[in-house]
Curated annotation (Swiss-Prot):
Record organism: Chlorobaculum tepidum (strain ATCC 49652 / DSM 12025 / NBRC 103806 / TLS) (Chlorobium tepidum)
GO biological process assignments: pantothenate biosynthetic process
Residues noted as binding 3-methyl-2-oxobutanoate in the record, renumbered to the chain: 53-54, 96, 126
Entry protein name: 3-methyl-2-oxobutanoate hydroxymethyltransferase
SUPFAM superfamilies from the UniProt entry: Phosphoenolpyruvate/pyruvate domain
Length: 277
């Protein structure tokens, strides 16, 4: 993305995220999957927008994130990037690499990361996993593509876990998570998402790493926070985990608006003369 001109705030980069951690400034990230929402988020001041494979759940209605493909992620990413470019161009845009787009081999990972970056002007990709994907992370960053890691609860591994419960509650798994975080940082990641792990552990990881940690259900000691936009706006009425704070109840607002529209159409009070040509 190009740098904004005039009085607009500078575009958030990997360097700026590192600076924010060093200064103790919290990083605010939200998901978006379309042009309109991306415009709203960018002008509202978020630091980063994640084009999440959670689109599989909230956009397409699947029960897991696994069905998303590289081409589907690119479709959503293009829309989000256009939305950001239409506004302040401030927010960093990060795109999830979907299931099986990087797990087969480092070569496959590089190829798919390159495709995602080449087909639109996003800023980085995100990958789930620790030591097992370290070589892929290194290879991708070596060719100039920034990578955000993801540890703790990893939705692409849901069938391995068997549930969405809190991860790293036991000492052995907590030690492994710390080790994986160090490995992913050493492989070149510029930040790591920590999902649904104990707050104390997230704080420990955040202090150990020089790169920012972005928490989702990981407590207040992370360097930043991320939520799925549909959850925090109250659009996902059948899903409300403990870590989600709802800032609006848009489901009810939309439902009432649609009911009013239907009533106006059926009563022939819409459109009026002022709304006609």
């Amino acid at each position: 993305m190009n740098q904004p001109s005039g009085n607009k705030l500078p575009h958030v980069t990997t360097r700026r995220m590192l600076d924010m951690k060093e200064r103790g400034e919290k990083i605010a990230m939200l998901t978006a999957y379309d042009y309109t929402m991306a415009r709203i988020l960018d002008r509202s001041g978020v630091d980063a927008i994640l084009v999440g494979d959670s689109a599989s759940n909230v956009f397409a209605g699947h029960s897991t994130t696994l069905p998303m493909t590289v081409d589907e992620m690119i479709y959503h990413a293009k829309a989000v990037v256009r939305g950001v470019q239409a506004e302040t161009r401030r927010a960093m845009v990060i795109v999830d690499m979907p299931f099986m787009s990087y797990q087969l081999s480092p070569e496959d990972a590089v190829r798919n990361a390159g495709k995602i970056m080449k087909e639109h002007e996003c800023d980085a990709v995100k990958m789930e996993g620790g030591k097992v994907i370290a070589e892929a992370v290194k290879r991708i960053t070596d060719i100039g593509i920034p990578v955000m890691g993801h540890l703790g609860l990893m939705p692409q591994s849901i069938y391995k876990y068997g549930s969405y419960k809190v991860r790293a509650m036991e000492e052995e798994e907590a030690r492994q998570l710390i080790e994986d975080a160090k490995i992913i940082e050493e492989a070149g990641a510029f930040a790591i998402v920590l999902e649904k792990i104990p707050s104390k552990l997230a704080g420990e990881v955040s202090r150990l790493l020089t790169i920012p940690t972005i928490g989702i259900g990981a407590g207040p000691e992370c360097d930043g926070q991320v939520l799925v936009i549909n959850d925090m706006l109250g659009l996902s009425t059948d899903f409300r985990p403990r870590f989600v704070r709802r800032y609006a109840d848009l489901s009810s607002v939309i439902e009432q608006a649609v009911k009013s529209y239907v009533e106006d159409v059926r009563s022939n009070s819409f459109p009026s003369e002022d709304e006609s040509y």
